[in-house]
């Protein structure tokens, strides 16, 4: 996104405040990726979550653990109940069990948001392979952006596509997730 002139804000969860402080003290060198995060990418502690999500945003990218799905559903529903929820792009893969059936995590998030009063959700997913270290170092990779609505998938794919991060799109959300 940065290479396509989009503003990027990264907001950590409440569990990542110490990590964010260390990152900033270390001149934005990410310890796990061993690469510098560009100054144009703004990194915030969770205390800025509400303020940033209430600004004019086109896309919320969710890079949370599978155990954090309920938490993020709580946070999003708290802010967007009765409002339009921006497009979501979920990086998290996996399955959950609901009423003795397997459910994709994108479906779980949608169910939780609807249960919490978000009438309209628009959740996309990305299928790789693409590793964070490769992306941070601009290693060529190819991904598929999937959404039940092909136009949304195409819009997000075009937003993210660069000369090293190659995107295609699909309306087969379940197929890309599995």
Regions found by a protein language model. Name each.
Residues 5-57, 70, 74, 78-79:
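Conserved N-terminal Rossmann-fold NAD(P) cofactor-binding segment
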Residues 45-47, 125-127, 169-171:
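Short loop/edge segments at beta-strand edges and connector loops
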Residues 1-3:
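Gly/Ala-rich phosphate-binding loop of Rossmann-like dinucleotide-binding domains
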Residues 13, 93, 148:
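Cofactor-binding loop segments of dinucleotide-utilizing enzymes, especially the Rossmann-like FAD-
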Residues 33-45, 84, 118-122, 163-165:
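A short helix-to-beta-strand connector/capping loop
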Residues 79, 115-122, 140-178:
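Internal alpha-helical scaffold of NAD(P)-dependent oxidoreductase catalytic cores
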Residues 7-9, 87-89, 124, 144, ...:
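A structural signal for isolated positions on well-ordered beta-strands in alpha/beta enzyme cores
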Residues 55, 59-138, 153-156:
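Rossmann-like NAD(P)(H) cofactor-binding subdomain of soluble oxidoreductases
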């Amino acid at each position: 996104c940065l290479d396509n002139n989009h503003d990027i804000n990264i907001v950590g969860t409440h569990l990542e405040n110490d990590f964010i402080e260390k990152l900033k003290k270390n001149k934005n060198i990410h310890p796990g990726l061993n690469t510098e995060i560009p100054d144009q990418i703004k990194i915030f502690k969770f205390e800025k979550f509400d303020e940033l999500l209430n600004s004019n945003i086109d896309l919320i990218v969710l890079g949370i653990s599978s155990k954090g799905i309920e938490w993020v559903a709580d946070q999003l529903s708290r802010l967007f109940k009765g409002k339009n929820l921006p497009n979501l792009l979920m990086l998290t893969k996996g399955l959950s069990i609901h009423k003795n059936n397997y459910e994709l995590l994108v479906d779980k998030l949608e169910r939780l948001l609807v249960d919490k009063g978000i009438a309209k959700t628009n959740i996309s997913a990305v299928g790789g392979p693409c590793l964070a270290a490769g992306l941070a170092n601009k290693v060529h990779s190819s991904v598929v952006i999937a959404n039940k609505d092909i136009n949304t998938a195409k819009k997000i794919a075009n937003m993210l596509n660069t000369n090293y991060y190659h995107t295609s799109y699909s309306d087969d959300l379940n197929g890309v997730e599995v």
